[in-house]
């Protein structure tokens, strides 16, 4: 379907350097490597974080374990904001 094709299109978030981590396990990152992900995370708009995570998944890049809580907190807060906006309409 068209939607499936669109959702599989890989979008980069100025993070091409993370491609070096394709296939690396989430618990195998060094502190410096985790910081590379953190730098991208905190220069990405909150509304784009879910798309960034999807991009990483499509590219075969696992998030560092140390960063997963931060990422899911941001995505969760963003969803709460979207739900509140919908409720206010």
What kind of region is each of these model predictions?
Residues 1-51:
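Membrane-proximal, non-transmembrane interface segments of integral membrane proteins
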